[in-house]
């Protein structure tokens, strides 16, 4: 059945947005879906975003917290959950998206709320993500009953730095929520750029020229995403090609909220109030609301922070301090966007043997240092190449002070006064940009609009165990064979050199895969015998049994790889002795 609508969904750490447009219009008529949600017991209101918060209950859900036609298997999603988080922090799940990409925990196990140890209230990051997506699907079905969600063309955006496992978990959550099997992922920074192109119309070609280099800096509630895009020319027409994406950086609005909570706790301490763990978590949520107010366009000079006193709700009362806008701006601007040189680098993690289990926030919160490191890895290795344009995305950049500081810092890195930095403006709402850009991506694909080229955002490798005498207690060294080069276009294939490798068949085996965002020049068939720890990232291994033609054992094979139009890496292991072939598959798409 032909889809009636293009739908783009920004599944955000703090807020989620659904945008849509009729599929058959000659112009992209993009709108944002008002999302029904509980705002108070017994009250349902429509908002243009869905706060990514989930209030948990023991037992059946009270009818005052239900919406007709909405599935609510896990609790209350949206505005009421966000609002109540400061009062009941141990019952509200927040930052599930950040936990979904936390590779050192089981993201399918009940972990959240992290502060609550009750098994009845805890939920997995995967299930929490499913709850948010389920609410969005139900909101669509309620308002477009003649156009079932599963029959539309859907794009779900993810951070450019999301690894394979995080994308697979997100895909699982989406399918469970009611997405069609053929929905696609799109990188959030690319979606933001598509939104800017849509906002400019044909005028974007007058603002950019050949050899310009764009930095998309996307700082959201949980992550910082960096993407480089270069303007190229093909047969007289300007084109956009992605050069690189940054590493996964767990820095965003959540870190800022924690920073303000630390500042506020000192204010409470100066009044003789030492906060306990429950109060500290409550303060974190209160600081999130305060930050949003104090950094808004019409911000007050200060906001009160009210925390329940120790003891019961009735006996303890509340304690309060005022948080000043000037302190908030100076603390966050200097802490997260300090003026640094192009050669400054973020500090590495500590060497403490034991660390508390929790979200793996970056040890260094200076976003400007991470930008410098990113450009050092991908841009400034080429002489005379510089950033010519900057595109902001993410709710953090609603604050003018953050934008101004980043422009000043990056501008200071350019070598001459003529190397000016141009900010790409004209975006009315940064909170809706990604969802709207995802819709325009689909429209452009169908109607011949500009497409951002770039292929795979990473290079991919398979782990090959080396041969040699066994040494007791020492595993054999592992080599990495490049099977997909950086930027390999979807729909293409390549032969992986002439190297023969032994493939284990007839027995369950563990296949190890790696990816890299920094090794952009490795060729198919290139064998790495050693690499720096920060160059390759191992993805979750694949354990499977490949059928044996004869007796189980090692079969000499050569490789061919193909990246399909759906973003699947197909690795063909072809026998060097017979016509037998085996295929392994990995999802590698973070953008089409």
Where does each model-flagged region fall?
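Conserved phosphate-binding catalytic cores of ATP/NTP-utilizing and phosphoryl-transfer enzymes
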Residues: 1-4, 184-217, 376-379, 432-451
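Early-domain small/polar-rich strand-loop-helix modules and first-structured segments
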Residues: 1-109, 184, 235-240, 247, ...
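Phosphate-binding loop and its immediate beta->loop->alpha context
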Residues: 28-177, 258-304, 308-350
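Phosphate/ATP-binding catalytic cores across multiple sugar-kinase/actin-like superfamilies
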Residues: 131-147, 192-207, 335-387, 405, ...
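Hydrophobic, small-residue-rich alpha-helical packing segments that form membrane-like cores
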Residues: 140-145, 153, 160-164, 168-223, ...
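Glycine-rich phosphate-binding loops at beta-strand->alpha-helix junctions
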Residues: 154-169, 308-312, 359-364, 383-409, ...
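Conserved phosphate-binding/catalytic loops in two-lobed NTP-binding clefts
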Residues: 178-191, 360, 406-437
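Acidic low-complexity intrinsically disordered segments
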Residues: 309-380, 449-592
